[in-house]
Curated annotation (Swiss-Prot):
It comes from Pseudomonas syringae pv. syringae (strain B728a). The keyword Cytoplasm applies. This is Xanthine phosphoribosyltransferase. Xanthine binds at L20, N27, K156. Belongs to the purine/pyrimidine phosphoribosyltransferase family. Xpt subfamily. One of its GO terms (cellular component) is cytoplasm. Homodimer. 5-phospho-alpha-D-ribose 1-diphosphate binds at A128, N129, G130, K131, A132. It is found in: Cytoplasm. The lineage of its organism: Bacteria, Pseudomonadati, Pseudomonadota, Gammaproteobacteria, Pseudomonadales.
Amino acid sequence: MEALHKKIREEGIVLSDQVLKVDAFLNHQIDPALMKEIGDEFARLFADAGVTKIVTIEASGIAPAVMAGLNMGVPVIFARKHQSLTLTENLLTASVYSFTKQVESTVAISPRHLSSDDNVLIIDDFLANGKASQALISIIKQAGATVAGLGIVIEKSFQGGRAELDAQGYRVESLARVESLAGGVVTFK
């Protein structure tokens, strides 16, 4: 997606050969016009998938997921990283390790929002080692629902997440595939 590539080139900051900072438009400050384009593109890519719900993890996946949900006319559920007084009943949970934050957390979704009738599109801001995606897949399976596919805003193709998801037979659509961050330069696949 050219608009996303341009934004990454102009406003993304390479912190290391493993870490790309995109807080100027995606995961701290949000560019609404770009999020609309991203949502439109996910809706186009998965128009034939029979999606009934979209699932993401708080917080950075919420903006692109909501835009896709708006375009597709389906609800968006975000897996919560923090327990709350209102999220208590027999939760669907999975552990996820964050490469960027270097912490493991438990994410949860209420079973009231997912059922075996659902065909779920996972949307996330990044795909690196695939741990967040695998956690969401686990939660969706616990509900007896089906995974329609995964929509990824930025994929770090040099890490193993995509290969693992491909090997499991999941459809993965990434809007920007980063091949390398070597030398402080973003190289797209």
